[in-house]
From Swiss-Prot, chain A:
<dbReference type="InterPro" id="IPR017104">
    <property type="entry name" value="AP2_complex_asu"/>
</dbReference>
<dbReference type="GO" id="GO:0009898">
    <property type="term" value="C:cytoplasmic side of plasma membrane"/>
</dbReference>
<dbReference type="GO" id="GO:0101003">
    <property type="term" value="C:ficolin-1-rich granule membrane"/>
</dbReference>
<keyword id="KW-0254">Endocytosis</keyword>
<dbReference type="GO" id="GO:0030669">
    <property type="term" value="C:clathrin-coated endocytic vesicle membrane"/>
</dbReference>
<dbReference type="InterPro" id="IPR013041">
    <property type="entry name" value="Clathrin_app_Ig-like_sf"/>
</dbReference>
<dbReference type="InterPro" id="IPR003164">
    <property type="entry name" value="Clathrin_a-adaptin_app_sub_C"/>
</dbReference>
<dbReference type="GO" id="GO:0005886">
    <property type="term" value="C:plasma membrane"/>
</dbReference>
<dbReference type="InterPro" id="IPR012295">
    <property type="entry name" value="TBP_dom_sf"/>
</dbReference>
<dbReference type="GO" id="GO:0005829">
    <property type="term" value="C:cytosol"/>
</dbReference>
<feature type="compositionally biased region" description="Low complexity">
    <location>
        <begin position="646"/>
        <end position="667"/>
    </location>
</feature>
<dbReference type="GO" id="GO:0036020">
    <property type="term" value="C:endolysosome membrane"/>
</dbReference>
<dbReference type="InterPro" id="IPR009028">
    <property type="entry name" value="Coatomer/calthrin_app_sub_C"/>
</dbReference>
<keyword id="KW-0472">Membrane</keyword>
<dbReference type="GO" id="GO:0035615">
    <property type="term" value="F:clathrin adaptor activity"/>
</dbReference>
<dbReference type="GO" id="GO:0031410">
    <property type="term" value="C:cytoplasmic vesicle"/>
</dbReference>
<feature type="binding site">
    <location>
        <begin position="11"/>
        <end position="12"/>
    </location>
    <ligand>
        <name>a 1,2-diacyl-sn-glycero-3-phospho-(1D-myo-inositol-3,4,5-trisphosphate)</name>
    </ligand>
</feature>
C-alpha cells in the first residue's frame, strides 16, 4: 500500500480538524465552527469563482461539521457542481457529500440525476461505481424513475465489469426496496438468476442479496434460483478451506455467501426430492463441521463458522420437515447453551425459541429446561436473561408449567425493572393456560401481585376476577386465599382490589368460619380503605353494599361507614355519589330487591385474552404469534387423551376501569345469560351459493403443507410474501374447533379481507363447518383470528378448501388452500391387549374391510418418529401386541355424528428395502381406504 | 439488510454514520443519542447483541472505538459481527494499524472504504483484496490527476 496521502491533499481541512480537537470547551468548539461556517459561506457567495480544489475542501469541511452533529443548510449546490468535475477526487467528494447529506426529497435531485446519467454513460468503471453508489445511498423515487429501467441492463450486459455488476445488483436492490412498482420485471430476471453460477464470488454475493429480496415478492418468477442456490452452496460447503482464496475467511469458505444462500432458500418450501437430497447433505455437512475441532483458535473463525450454522438451523426450522435434522439442530443448540461465549448462549436461546414451536423438536427442546433455568439465575447480562425468559415461555406446556411458572416467579423477585412487566404478563398467561387446578392459578396470580404488584397491570387482575367468577369450583378457595393474603400488614393495592371484589362476591363462602366472619371480613377490608387511591375506594364501597346483601347482620355497621362525613361529603364526586346511593339503597330497598340488584355477577363472555393482547402489543404481533403457537399443549396431541376443560384457552372481556360493579348508575345488571354461542349467529358455509366470486386454484405447495397437518394440529398452513396463515385446532370425538390466524406480513392494510370455507357437494352433507366472518380490514403487521366449529356427521374423503380474497395496495389477491380437516382427526385411541386385537382383526377379515398399501419410505425410517406419527394420527399405539417387535399396530375409533367406526392398523417396515406395508381394517371400506391414503403419505 | 452503521468513541463522540434507509435528520439524531447511551452503558463481557426498538443491534469495541450496526429481525448476528471485523481489517490494512485519529482526520477515506465494502445495507464484496484494490486504484487516479 502506498503511503497514504492522508489529508495532505487538503491541509486546510486537517488544520480545521486539529483546531476543533484543541477546543477546550463546547462553547469554544461552537465558536470555531461558526467562524468556519461564516468563512465558507462568504467564499461560496464571493465574487471570485472558486477552483475545484477549494470547493472540494470546503465541502469536506461542511461534511466534517455535519458529522460533529451540526445542521448544514448550504453547500449542496457546490457539491452538485463537484459531480461534473472530471477530477476523480473532486467528483468523489461531491458524491460523498450528497450520499451523506442529501435527503431523498431534495430539490436538487434533478441536477444530481443529470450528473449520474453522464457518469453511468461514461463507461469508466470507477465513475459508474460512484454513480451507482449515489443512487443506492439516496434511493429516492425520482432516482428510481430515472434509472430503474437502465440499471438492469447494466447488470446483465455481457461486457459489464464484475465490480460494476456488483454495484448494479445492490443498487437495483435498493431501488426495488423503496419503489418496487418502478422496477420492471422482464427478460433480465432469468439472467440475474444465472448470476448465481457466476465465476466471480463477489458477483454471486451481491446477486444473491438481490435475488432473495425479489424472490420474496415474486416467488414464482425466481423459482429456478432454488436449485442453483443449492448447488452453489453444496460447492462451497464441500470445498477445502483454501479453494476459495480470498473468499475464505479465517478458514471458513465464503461465510457471507453461504449465509445469503441459506437465507434465499428460506423464501421457499422444501425443494423437490432430487434437490432436497443435495440440500440435506449440505445441511448435514454444516452440522458435522460444528463437531470438528476448530481450524483456528481465533474468535473470527468460530463466529464465521457458527454464523453459517445458525443460518442453516434457521432453514431447517423453516422447512420443519426433517425430524432428524431438527433433532440434530436442537442438540447442537443445546451444546451452545453451555458455551463459554456469551454470544453463542444468547443466539442458542433465541434460536431454540423457534425450535420449540416445531412438533418434532418440542420435546427435545424441553430436555434443556434445567440449563435454561440456570441461565435465568446466573447470566450476568440482562439481554441473555431476557432470551431465557422467552425460551421458557416458548417451551412451556402442561407437563412443565408448574416448574416454569415457579422459576419465573422466583426470578421476578430480583428481575431487572426493564423486563418485569413482560414477565408478569407471561406468568399470568402461562398460569391461566396450563392451569389444571385453578387453586394453583389463584395462588400464582396472588403471588405475582405480592412480588411485583406495581407491574401487575389491570388486565392481569381483571383476568383473575373473571376466571374466579366463571368457575364456581374455585370461588371458595379464592375467597379464603385473598382473605389470608389481606392479613399481611402491608399489601399491594392490587391485592386490595382483587380481595375486595372477590369477598364482595364470594365472602359468604367463608363466612361460616368464625375466624372469617362477616364482620371480620369487613373490618379487614376497611382497615385498608384509607390507604388506597380513589378507584380502589370506589371498588371497596361496592363491596360494602354487596356485603349488605350477603350479610344482613353487618348492615348497620356498613351504613354507619357510608353515613360518615368522609364518605357522604367526600370531595371526590364518584365516592360521594356511591356513598349516597348505596346508603339510600340499603335503607329503602326490600330484601328481595336488594338480592336482585346485588346478585352475584354473571359469568363473563369469552373473548380473546386481554393479557395476551397486551403482550402482543408489547412485543409486536409476529413474535407473539410464534410463541402462541408454541404453547399448544403437546401432551394432549400425543396422548390423544381427554382434553381438559377448554375454558383456559380463550378468554374473557375486561370490566371497565372504574369498575362499576353494580351498574347502578345505568341499567340493572343483565340476567346471566349464557355467552353467545358461535352457532347462533354463525355463518353457515353456503356451498350452493353461486354468487361467490371466482375461487383461486390451490396455492402451490399446498398439498405438502396439507400432508404435514395430518399428524399434527398446529402450525403454519400457508405463507407467502403478504400473508401467513397459522392453525391451531383441537378435536374431541366427532367435534372440533379450529383457530385460523391470518397474519398480515406487510406494513400495509388488507382491505375487503374475506376468508370463505368451501365444501364440495360430496363433502357438504358429511362435514359441518360453522364460522363467523372476520373484520374486513387487517392492519399492517396485525393478525386476526377466526374460529371454525367443526362437526363430523359421517365419514368423508375430501378436505374443505379455504379461499381468501382481499385487496392489497390496489391489487386483488386470491388464495386457496386445503384446510387440513381429515377423517383421522375424529379418532379416539383405544387400548387393547394382544389377544383382543387379533380377535378383532380376524373379525374384520372381509375383503372390503381391508385396504393395504406397500410403498417406499420417503423419510428416514426412525422408530421413534414413526411412533410419534402414529400417535399423532390419532390411534392408540399398541405395544407388545405384534409378535414382531419391529411392527407397529394401532387401534382407535372414528367418531362421527351418525356412527362410530372401529379401526385397526398395522405398519410393517422393511428396513433393507426401505419400504413399508400398511394395512387398515375397519368396518367400512371407504374409511379404510381414506385412512390408508392419509397415513401412507406420512412415512 | 443493515439499517445503519455508527462509529463512536467511548466518550460518546460520533465518528462515522452511514444510513441505509431514508431517515430524517431529527430521527437520526434521536436514534444515535439513544443507542449510544444503551451501548456505552454495557459492561465488557456482555453479549454483542441486543434488541433495540424493532431492530437487532450488533456492536463491538475496538480500542476506544465502538462499531455498531443495526440490522433487521431476520438478519444473521454473527455474520454482522464479522462484517464489522472485516471493515476494521480493511481500515487497518489501509492506514497501517488504524487508530481513532486516522478515522477522525481521514473520515472521507473511512467512508470510501465502507462504500466499497457495503452498499445499500448489503455486502458488496467480502474479499479484502478486491476492496483494497478498488481503493488503491482510486488513490492512484487521484495522484495521476494531481500530477496532471
Amino acid at each position: 500500500m502506498p503511503a497514504v496521502s492522508k489529508g495532505d491533499g487538503m491541509r486546510g481541512l486537517a488544520v480545521f480538524i486539529s483546531d476543533i480537537r484543541n477546543c477546550k470547551s463546547k462553547e469554544a468548539e461552537i465558536k470555531r465552527i461558526n467562524k468556519e461556517l461564516a468563512n465558507i459561506r462568504s467564499k461560496f457567495k464571493g465574487d471570485k469563482a472558486l477552483d475545484g480544489y477549494s470547493k472540494k475542501k470546503y465541502v469536506c469541511k461542511l461534511l466534517f461539521i455535519f458529522l460533529l452533529g451540526h445542521d448544514i443548510d448550504f453547500g449542496h449546490m457546490e457539491a452538485v457542481n463537484l459531480l461534473s468535475s472530471n477530477r476523480y477526487t473532486e467528483k468523489q467528494i461531491g458524491y460523498l457529500f450528497i450520499s451523506v447529506l442529501v435527503n431523498s426529497n431534495s430539490e436538487l435531485i434533478r441536477l444530481i440525476n443529470n450528473a449520474i446519467k453522464n457518469d453511468l454513460a461514461s463507461r469508466n468503471p470507477t465513475f459508474m461505481g460512484l454513480a451507482l453508489h449515489c443512487i443506492a445511498s439516496v434511493g429516492s423515487r425520482e432516482m428510481a424513475e430515472a434509472f430503474a429501467g437502465e440499471i438492469p441492463k447494466v447488470l446483465v450486459a455481457g461486457d459489464t465489469m464484475d465490480s460494476v455488476k456488483q454495484s448494479a445488483a445492490l443498487c437495483l436492490l435498493r431501488l426495488y426496496r423503496t419503489s418496487p412498482d418502478l422496477v420492471p420485471m422482464g427478460d433480465w430476471t432469468s439472467r440475474v438468476v444465472h448470476l448465481l453460477n457466476d465465476q466471480h464470488l463477489g458477483v454471486v454475493t451481491a446477486a444473491t442479496s438481490l435475488i432473495t429480496t425479489l424472490a420474496q415478492k415474486n416467488p414464482e418468477e425466481f423459482k429456478t434460483s432454488v436449485s442453483l442456490a443449492v448447488s452453489r452452496l453444496s460447492r462451497i460447503v464441500t470445498s477445502a478451506s483454501t479453494d476459495l482464496q480470498d473468499y475464505t475467511y479465517y478458514f471458513v469458505p465464503a461465510p457471507w455467501l453461504s449465509v445469503k444462500l441459506l437465507r434465499l432458500l428460506q423464501c421457499y418450501p422444501p425443494p423437490d426430492p432430487a434437490v432436497r437430497g443435495r440440500l440435506t447433505e449440505c445441511l448435514e455437512t454444516i452440522l458435522n463441521k460444528a463437531q470438528e475441532p476448530p481450524k483456528s483458535k481465533k474468535v473470527q473463525h468460530s463466529n464465521a463458522k457458527n454464523a453459517v450454522l445458525f443460518e442453516a438451523i434457521s432453514l431447517i426450522i423453516h422447512h420443519d420437515s426433517e425430524p432428524n435434522l431438527l433433532v440434530r439442530a436442537c442438540n447442537q443448540l443445546g451444546q451452545f447453551l453451555q458455551h463459554r461465549e456469551t454470544n453463542l448462549r444468547y443466539l442458542a436461546l433465541e434460536s431454540m425459541c423457534t425450535l420449540a414451536s416445531s412438533e418434532f423438536s418440542h420435546e427435545a427442546v424441553k430436555t434443556h429446561i434445567e440449563t435454561v433455568i440456570n441461565a435465568l439465575k446466573t447470566e450476568r447480562d440482562v439481554s441473555v436473561r431476557q432470551r431465557a425468559v422467552d425460551l421458557l415461555y416458548a417451551m412451556c406446556d402442561r407437563s412443565n408449567a408448574p416448574q416454569i411458572v415457579a422459576e419465573m416467579l422466583s426470578y421476578l423477585e430480583t428481575a431487572d425493572y426493564s423486563i418485569r412487566e413482560e414477565i408478569v404478563l407471561k406468568v399470568a398467561i402461562l398460569a391461566e393456560k396450563y392451569a389444571v387446578d385453578y387453586t394453583w392459578y389463584v395462588d400464582t396470580i396472588l403471588n405475582l401481585i405480592r412480588i411485583a404488584g406495581d407491574y401487575v397491570s389491570e388486565e392481569v387482575w381483571y383476568r383473575v376476577i373473571q376466571i374466579v367468577i366463571n368457575r364456581d369450583d374455585v370461588q371458595g378457595y379464592a375467597a379464603k386465599t385473598v382473605f389470608e393474603a389481606l392479613q399481611a400488614p402491608a399489601c399491594h393495592e392490587n391485592l386490595v382490589k382483587v380481595g375486595g371484589y372477590i369477598l364482595g362476591e364470594f365472602g359468604n363462602l367463608i363466612a361460616g368460619d368464625p375466624r372469617s366472619s362477616p364482620l371480620i371480613q369487613f373490618h379487614l377490608l376497611h382497615s385498608k380503605f384509607h390507604l388506597c387511591s380513589v378507584p380502589t375506594r370506589a371498588l371497596l364501597l361496592s363491596t360494602y353494599i354487596k356485603f349488605v346483601n350477603l350479610f344482613p347482620e353487618v348492615k348497620p355497621t356498613i351504613q354507619d361507614v357510608l353515613r360518615s362525613d368522609s364518605q357522604l361529603r367526600n370531595a371526590d364526586v364518584e365516592l360521594q355519589q356511591r356513598a349516597v346511593e348505596y346508603l339510600r339503597l340499603s335503607t329503602v330497598a326490600s330484601t328481595d330487591i336488594l338480592a336482585t340488584v346485588l346478585e352475584e355477577m354473571p359469568p363473563f363472555p369469552e373473548r380473546e385474552s386481554s393479557i395476551l393482547a397486551k403482550l402482543k402489543k408489547k412485543k409486536g404481533p409476529s413474535t407473539v404469534t410464534d410463541l402462541e403457537d408454541t404453547k399448544r399443549d403437546r401432551s394432549v396431541d400425543v396422548n390423544g387423551g381427554p382434553e381438559p376443560a377448554p375454558a383456559s384457552t380463550s378468554a374473557v372481556s375486561t370490566p371497565s376501569p372504574s369498575a362499576d360493579l353494580l351498574g347502578l348508575g345505568a341499567a340493572p345488571p343483565a340476567p346471566a345469560g349464557p355467552p353467545p354461542s358461535s352457532g347462533g349467529s354463525g355463518l353457515l358455509v353456503d356451498v350452493f351459493s353461486d354468487s361467490a366470486s371466482v375461487v383461486a386454484p390451490l396455492a402451490p405447495g399446498s398439498e405438502d403443507n396439507f400432508a404435514r397437518f395430518v399428524c399434527k394440529n398446529n402450525g403454519v398452513l400457508f405463507e407467502n410474501q403478504l400473508l401467513q396463515i397459522g392453525l391451531k385446532s383441537e378435536f374431541r370425538q366427532n367435534l372440533g374447533r379450529m383457530f385460523i390466524f391470518y397474519g398480515n406480513k406487510t406494513s400495509t392494510q388488507f382491505l375487503n379481507f374475506t376468508p370463505t370455507l368451501i365444501c364440495s357437494d360430496d363433502l357438504q352433507p358429511n362435514l359441518n363447518l360453522q364460522t363467523k366472518p372476520v373484520d374486513p380490514t387487517v392492519e399492517g403487521g396485525a393478525q386476526v383470528q377466526q374460529v371454525v366449529n367443526i362437526e363430523c356427521v359421517s365419514d368423508f374423503t375430501e378436505a374443505p378448501v379455504l379461499n381468501i380474497q382481499f385487496r392489497y395496495g390496489g391489487t386483488f389477491q386470491n388464495v386457496s388452500v386445503q384446510l387440513p380437516i381429515t377423517l383421522n382427526k375424529f379418532f379416539q385411541p383405544t387400548e387393547m391387549a394382544s389377544q383382543d386385537f387379533f380377535q378383532r382383526w380376524k373379525q374384520l377379515s372381509n375383503p372390503q374391510q381391508e385396504v393395504q398399501n406397500i410403498f417406499k419410505a420417503k423419510h428416514p425410517m426412525d422408530t421413534e418418529v414413526t411412533k410419534a406419527k402414529i400417535i399423532g394420527f390419532g390411534s392408540a399405539l399398541l405395544e407388545e401386541v405384534d409378535p414382531n417387535p419391529a411392527n407397529f399396530v394401532g387401534a382407535g375409533i372414528i367418531h362421527t355424528k351418525t356412527t362410530q367406526i372401529g379401526c385397526l392398523l398395522r405398519l410393517e417396515p422393511n428396513l433393507q428395502a426401505q419400504m413399508y406395508r400398511l394395512t387398515l381394517r375397519t368396518s367400512k371400506e371407504a374409511v379404510s381406504q381414506r385412512l390408508c391414503e392419509l397415513l401412507s403419505a406420512q412415512f | 439488510m443493515m439499517r445503519f452503521m455508527l462509529l463512536f468513541s467511548r466518550q460518546g463522540k460520533l465518528r462515522l454514520q452511514k444510513w441505509y434507509l431514508a431517515t430524517s435528520d431529527k430521527e437520526r439524531k434521536k436514534m444515535v443519542r439513544e443507542l449510544m447511551q444503551v451501548v456505552l452503558a454495557r459492561k465488557p463481557k456482555m453479549c454483542s447483541f441486543l434488541e433495540w426498538r424493532d431492530l437487532k443491534v450488533v456492536y463491538k469495541r475496538y480500542a476506544s472505538l465502538y462499531f455498531c450496526c443495526a440490522i433487521e429481525g431476520q438478519d444473521n448476528e454473527l455474520i454482522t459481527l464479522e462484517l464489522i471485523h472485516r471493515y476494521v481489517e480493511l481500515l487497518d490494512k489501509y492506514f497501517g494499524s488504524v487508530c481513532e485519529l486516522d478515522i477522525i482526520f481521514n473520515f472521507e477515506k473511512a467512508y470510501f472504504i465502507l462504500d466499497e465494502f457495503l452498499m445499500g445495507g448489503d455486502v458488496q464484496d467480502t474479499s479484502k483484496k478486491s476492496v483494497l484494490k478498488a481503493i488503491e486504484q482510486a488513490d492512484l487516479l487521484q495522484e495521476e490527476m494531481g500530477l496532471a
